[in-house]
Amino acid sequence: VGQEEDFDAVREKALKCGAKDFILDDVRREFVEELIFPAIQANAIYEDVYLLGTSLARPVIARGMIETAEKMQCQFVSHGCTGKGNDQVRFELAFYGLNPDIKVIAPWRIPKFYQRFAGRSDLLEYAASKGIPVTQTKSKPWSTDENLFHISYEAGILEDPNTTPPADMWKLTQAPEKA
């Protein structure tokens, strides 16, 4: 969906983690034509500030996943969305709408998984112990969701509106006084 990403590194990481293959679909055109342009035309901005870039990207990602799953004759797809957020619903409704027979593996809803990994710290420790490269660190625990339309950040330290986000977090912007 147009994020800035080192896909060779993603491929290497996927294979190192046990994937049998890595398939990269370029869905930027579909994302722009089917979702971004109509959203701009409709002035689709949540609460007058949020561009909906994350939620807009999910249908085109889900469609690509289902098309690939069907081509590879897979019975299952998976996502890494937490069991608390809207993303799991966005993905799964799209999956089932496109292929009602598909089975979805959602690790964050599997008790054995979420009991083992209570949060980001546990995941970071596990990745480090297995030599799995990740961009987050304990000092920079936020995750990003980036696409052609926007970028969003998420982490516990960002949930408190009285806490100013770290200046080195921003990727597409910077403080006005530094512009």
What function would you assign to each model-found segment?
Residues 1-179:
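Nucleotide-activated chemistry modules centered on ATP-dependent adenylation/adenylyltransferase
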